[in-house]
Amino acid sequence: MADDKPKEGVKTENNDHINLKVAGQDGSVVQFKIKRQTPLSKLMKAYCERQGLSMRQIRFRFDGQPINETDTPAQLEMEDEDTIDVFQQQTGGSF
């Protein structure tokens, strides 16, 4: 009886939401469902929390271009199942 609500990811034809993949350098992939008009900062922060990282430690790129926190999937013309790449910042040379 706990499963009364319909599953969300079933109707991907609804153009209001988009499924995005975030691929880390270690080969890990995390999937997110986000509204096309939602700033990507929400996805970026959620990814950092899930991975235990700070926003200062990593950079997000889509099609090789840096993503700004204010960008939305609609602005970047992202399509369903597109992939965002994550790169760790290279800082300093000491341990």
UniProtKB/Swiss-Prot annotation:
Main location: nucleus
A molecular function (GO) term: protein tag activity
Top-level taxonomic group: Eukaryota
Propeptide: 94-95
Cross-link (Glycyl lysine isopeptide (Gly-Lys) (interchain with K-? in acceptor proteins)): 93
Entry keyword set: Isopeptide bond, Nucleus, Ubl conjugation, Ubl conjugation pathway
All residue ranges annotated as the Ubiquitin-like domain in the record: 16-95
Pfam families in UniProt: Rad60-SLD
Covalent link (Glycyl lysine isopeptide (Lys-Gly) (interchain with G-Cter in SUMO)) residue numbers: 11
InterPro entries named among the record's database cross-references: Rad60/SUMO-like_dom, Ubiquitin-like_dom, Ubiquitin-like_domsf
SMART domains linked: UBQ (SM00213)
GO CC field: nucleus
Gene Ontology terms: biological process: protein sumoylation
Keyword Nucleus among UniProt keywords: yes
Keyword Nucleus listed: yes
Family per similarity comment: Belongs to the ubiquitin family. SUMO subfamily.
Quaternary data: Interacts with sae2 and ube2i. Covalently attached to a number of proteins, including top2.
Described purpose of this protein according to its UniProt entry: Ubiquitin-like protein that can be covalently attached to proteins as a monomer or as a lysine-linked polymer. Covalent attachment via an isopeptide bond to its substrates requires prior activation by the E1 complex sae1-sae2 and linkage to the E2 enzyme ube2i, and can be promoted by an E3 ligase such as pias1-4. This post-translational modification on lysine residues of proteins plays a crucial role in a number of cellular processes such as nuclear transport, DNA replication and repair, mitosis and signal transduction.
PANTHER family: SMALL UBIQUITIN-RELATED MODIFIER
Protein known as: Small ubiquitin-related modifier 2-A
Source organism of this protein record: Xenopus laevis
